[in-house]
């Protein structure tokens, strides 16, 4: 009996240890970690009711700990539910965090971290060349040749610094979505308006007839948080679902930060739900596998090319990159009217988002778009980087 009792105690202890959630550590710069700010992801199969009960319990635990210890953490901030992928973000003290990790319904927890735009230098009045390049087999031709459907009936979510939805380049096709960054719905930076103009502008865009939704997740300085981005993605999926446009939607994420499993899981759920997701590879001239959401295998990760079909000097690279697209010296709209020129993988990604909408409008399933774009792409990029594709975005115009 003693042996059996000892064994049962051992097994109980083992089960308890096994039930503890994983605390995932990121490979990013520790300076980008937001203190006491955490993203909690539930295990697959946790029901809506169990999730709500867990959230309520954590809120009560945090409140009790705050009262006892006088901590200044803010507790629960926002919840996520992306096609039954459930989680939340909050500011918690160490004792509350420990309780969360010991809950058997929790899959993993990670630090929230700063995420930034993937754009670089602004050069005014520079020539535009990207549209011509993606519609011709040879470089140097400025005419843009495209099917006149141009994304008609497809909606593109611009997850960025906001969008000037009244800009003349959008001709009334843009609407406001949500803001998870701050209390100012304007695009004070210009990055989001520029990328939206690239994926769906009437003058500067690929999918000239697509609808546009502004999803602000980054502030006027071009930075935000992983939790804010996940909240933005959560909005996109729920909005598309409520409007019946899953399968007729795309999303552009011209942003990135250090590796985040939660960020990768969120974009993967969006992609699997029926939204084509294009993301910037990043601008550090390093392997994109260490960045999120660029490292998510399910999405279309885009590196940046120059007018001479070379890898942009700043562009990240690596086997996770799906395709190259024009990203150096790209002219597009700026808030308040007019245009400006920017460089970065931020400028490459919306070329692919727009082309994805273009393909969806022609009947291709969003979950097959990235593979289709790779199939018709051109083997044009010189010195693409270690273990990196040399394929350049092309719309298959035959030119």
Swiss-Prot record:
Domain Inhibitor I9, chain residue ranges per copy: 37-117
Cleaved signal peptide residues: 1-19
A GO CC term assigned to this protein in UniProt: extracellular region
Domain Peptidase S8: 128-399
TM ranges: none
GO MF, one example: serine-type endopeptidase activity
GO biological process: proteolysis
Subcellular location field: Secreted
Superkingdom of origin: Eukaryota
Residues modified by glycosylation: 252, 308, 395
CDD domains listed in its UniProt record: Peptidases_S8_PCSK9_ProteinaseK_like (cd04077)
Catalytic residues of the enzyme: 160, 191, 346
Keyword terms: Glycoprotein, Hydrolase, Protease, Secreted, Serine protease, Signal, Virulence, Zymogen
Propeptide: 20-118
EC number: 3.4.21.-
Record function comment: Secreted subtilisin-like serine protease with keratinolytic activity that contributes to pathogenicity.
Similarity comment text for this entry: Belongs to the peptidase S8 family.
Name recorded for this polypeptide: Subtilisin-like protease 4
């Amino acid at each position: 009996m003693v042996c059996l009792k000892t064994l049962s105690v051992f097994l109980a202890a083992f089960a308890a240890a096994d039930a503890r959630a994983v605390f995932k550590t990121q490979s990013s710069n520790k300076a980008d970690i937001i203190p006491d700010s955490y993203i909690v992801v539930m295990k697959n199969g946790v029901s809506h009711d169990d999730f709500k009960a867990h959230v309520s319990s954590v809120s009560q635990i945090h409140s009790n700990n705050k009262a006892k210890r006088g901590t200044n953490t803010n507790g629960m901030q926002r919840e996520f539910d992306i096609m039954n992928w459930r989680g939340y973000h909050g500011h918690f003290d160490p004792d509350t965090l420990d309780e969360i990790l010991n809950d058997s319904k929790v899959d993993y927890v990670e630090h929230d971290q700063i995420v930034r735009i993937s754009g670089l230098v602004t050069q005014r009045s520079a020539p535009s060349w990207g549209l011509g390049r993606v519609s011709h087999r040879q470089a140097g031709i400025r005419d843009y040749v495209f099917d006149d459907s141009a994304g008609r009936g497809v909606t593109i979510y611009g997850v960025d610094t906001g969008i000037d939805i009244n800009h003349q380049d959008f001709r009334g096709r843009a609407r406001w979505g949500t803001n998870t960054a701050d209390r100012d719905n304007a695009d004070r930076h210009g990055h989001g308006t520029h990328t939206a103009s690239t994926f769906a502008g009437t003058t500067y865009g690929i999918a000239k007839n697509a609808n546009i939704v502004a999803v602000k997740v980054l502030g006027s300085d071009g930075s935000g948080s992983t939790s804010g981005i996940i909240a933005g993605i959560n909005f996109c999926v729920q909005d598309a679902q409520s409007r019946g446009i899953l399968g007729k939607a795309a999303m552009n994420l011209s942003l990135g930060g250090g590796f985040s499993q939660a960020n990768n899981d969120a974009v993967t759920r969006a992609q699997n739900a029926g939204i084509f997701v294009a993301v910037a590879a990043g601008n550090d001239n390093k392997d994109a596998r260490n960045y999120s959401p660029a490292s998510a295998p399910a999405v279309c990760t885009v590196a940046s090319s120059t007018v001479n079909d070379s890898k942009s000097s700043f562009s990240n690279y690596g086997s996770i990159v799906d395709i190259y697209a024009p990203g150096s010296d790209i002219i597009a709209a700026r808030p308040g009217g007019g245009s400006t020129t920017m460089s970065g993988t931020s400028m490459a990604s919306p070329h692919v988002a727009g082309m994805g909408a273009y393909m969806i409008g022609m009947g291709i399933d969003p979950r097959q778009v990235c593979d289709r774009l790779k199939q018709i792409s051109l083997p044009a990029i010189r010195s693409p980087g270690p273990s990196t594709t040399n394929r350049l975005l092309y719309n298959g115009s035959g030119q």
